[in-house]
Amino acid sequence: MRKILFSIFIFSLSMIAVAISGKVIKVSDGDTLLLQSGSKRIKVRMYGIDAPELKQNYGEDSKSYLEKRILNKNIDVKVINEDKYGRKVGKVFYKNKDINLEMIETGNAWFYEYHAKKEKEYRKAFKSAQEQKLGLWKDKNPQNPRNFRLENKRED
């Protein structure tokens, strides 16, 4: 019985989302940033979105938008997990606003459905941005960043 209770306790701890706060000291691109949290520097990959790569159409615009919104600002990150590169993957909040969602709403990022299937609000915002031709959706044929990365990996 104790083993079962202990297992349930450990499992429930793993389900609790970790939150970190800090100041954004660098925006690498439209979905990655560097956070100064106390004495630690933490690389954060924004959950559920995929922004154009910097060498891709609209990549610099996406980065610039994110910089204007959160660079040198104090934010909160609800950490979902850690990726294979050691980055914290999470939802970024500035003044309680979901910046990940905002990046999709404004056409600055794609909804990364593969990693965030349950994010119905993200899916809805993605479709709305496409219909309104906002941001990267002004292009007639925008390329999914994932496909761009795959194509350019072959050329290296």
List each model region and its residues.
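Small beta-barrel nucleic-acid-binding modules, primarily SNase/OB-fold domains
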Residues: 2-156
